[in-house]
Amino acid sequence: MLKIETGRIIKSLSGFYDVRTENKVITCRARGHMRRGGMSPLVGDIVDISVEKGKGMVERIHPRKNSFVRPAVANLELLVIFAANVNPVTEPFLIDRVCAIAGDQEVPVCICVNKCDMDPGTDLAAIYRQAGYTVIQTSAETGMGIDELRNALRGKFCAFTGNSGVGKSSILNALSPELKLPVGEVSEKLGRGRHTTRHVELYDVDDALIADTPGFSSFDTDQMEVILKENLQYAFPEFGRYLGQCQFRDCSHRKEPGCAVTTALAAGEIGKTRYDSYLKLYEKAMQINEWELK
């Protein structure tokens, strides 16, 4: 009879999964029925594995608290979204889409405005503080914000995500210098970073567990989850205090008269770039039927 052990997937690469059990790390493959059933293991999954002749096999994936397509992780307790106001400048819509996906799954978000030694990103930080997010301004070069970020991560299973070249790996190195992760350069011609992180892998940093994930660009947004239009309003925390105050119960917060959200927008209580992102995501959601997401 095979011995079954339980552990967490800490690395996924080319169909192989490194699973950390109580006292060791075992490289495993997944049973074919998982792949055929459309539920492939993700970094962060709690799994049961069997080991025979030194080879591991993922037998079962425990129920997930949450899961993401991009970054490809499960069971997050905090998602840290990296952004910068210098080359490569982060598009607000990219931040907002990832924020909304996390909000839809009730995963807390921290916005890390990085490279503040080059540009403090004050306006960018203000947008997300106004929206109700935790915002930390950091610099791997000067150490700005590193201790504050360390405290925010403490005791949590987290993922670092953001566009390529925004400095996720540099901040991980600043948090834990012994990691010595490779750091890429930003292409001056293309204005975007080169990928240095090519797979998702977990790292122990103090008492936090951090997933470093590959960077993405605006071309990757179509691979991300789509939120049902009925749920989208709840994924924007700054809308919360106005929900239920609109003239119409089924208000979409777009063109309807008596909308409390658009009234707040006109009064400057909701940021315009955030609201514009809501409209773009709503348009995408209108093209999706609920049955397509199951």
Walk through the language-model features, giving the residues of each:
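Helix-rich effector regions associated with P-loop NTPase G domains
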Residues: L2-K3, G15, G38-K55, I61-L79, ...
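SH3/SH3-like beta-barrel fold
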Residues: Y17-T21, C28, I49
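Canonical P-loop GTPase G-domain recognition
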Residues: K115-V166
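A conserved segment at the C-terminal end of the G1
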Residues: K168-G184
